[in-house]
Amino acid sequence: TFYDESCPDVSNIVRRVVQQALVSDERAGARLIRLHFHDCFVNGCDGSVLLEDQPGVVSELAAPGNANITGFNIVNNIKAAVEKACPGVVSCADILAIASVGSVNLAGGPCWEVQLGRRDSRRANLQGAIDGLPSPFENVTQLKRKFDRVDLDSTDLVALSGAHTFGKSRCQFFDRRLNVSNPDSTLNPRYAQQLRQACSSGRDTFVNLDPTTPNKFDKNYYTNLQSNTGPLTSDQVLHSTPGEDTVKIVNLFAASQNQFFESFGQSMINMGNIQPLTGNQGEIRSNCRRLN
């Protein structure tokens, strides 16, 4: 791979730090893969999501889709460990890609061969983040449009949404579905009652995205959608929208974890290949949050 000569141990270094983070934070893996996803969907996988406001940069973190995004401290720890071994060599964009494999695999999911050699951008794109990031309130047509913009298809949409087999969501992103006088017909009534109870302590309360095996990377995300127990609209619509090709794909992954794992790895590679900066474009940031 790209770092064979310059930083041969990079994957192990990253994996070790992710493993350490998981000891005290069960959501560490979900945080990291979400950063990679939100990075790739805006100007390609260029580390732009990590930049904070600074001279010449208006951060993407002000976009609604990035409002609750976390995990920067873990990225900083990974970057520090990698810099110690190979200073000035590995980009922050590549760190997110490598960390995503470790995050999934350490939770019981698949491995895939990450292509490396991305460079870090010297700019952010706030408007791109506002327009391009999928929202938890969207229907299949809206979601497909956003995936299509970055050349990802329906299989990619359904496979990558499967990353919601771990991690959590705040109640504010689905509580409009819990209205007692106007119940959402695609939400299991018993499960809706559990969610109402969980969310009674406030809209900022966190709830597991996968109520069955919340920290395990498995196919239960899809079987949950079959039983109408996906808390987010943007997940449930993949199975509950009649006539959409996404329904068949959900059923396929629900029936075969091997099929899901294989497709997930391929879709992660596809996503990781969105418009990377290479060669002498961009830079290798020494601090992932700041331009050099």
Swiss-Prot record:
Binding-site residues, Ca(2+) 2: T165, D210, T213, D218
Residues at which substrate binds: P134
Disulphide connectivity of cysteines: C7-C86, C40-C45, C92-C288, C171-C199
Chemical reaction(s) catalysed: 2 a phenolic donor + H2O2 = 2 a phenolic radical donor + 2 H2O
EC number(s) per entry: 1.11.1.7
Name of the protein in its database record: Peroxidase 2
Entry annotation: catalytic residues: H38
Record organism: Cucumis sativus
Cofactor: binding comment: Binds 2 calcium ions per subunit.
Binding site for heme b: H164
Cofactor: Ca(2+); heme b
Glycosylation sites: N68, N139, N179
Superkingdom to which the source organism belongs: Eukaryota
Chain positions of site Transition state stabilizer: R34
Any GO molecular function: metal ion binding
Pfam families with a match to the protein in the record: peroxidase (PF00141)
Any one Gene Ontology BP term: response to oxidative stress
Functional note: Removal of H(2)O(2), oxidation of toxic reductants, biosynthesis and degradation of lignin, suberization, auxin catabolism, response to environmental stresses such as wounding, pathogen attack and oxidative stress. These functions might be dependent on each isozyme/isoform in each plant tissue.
Positions contributing to Ca(2+) 1 binding: D39, V42, G44, D46, S48
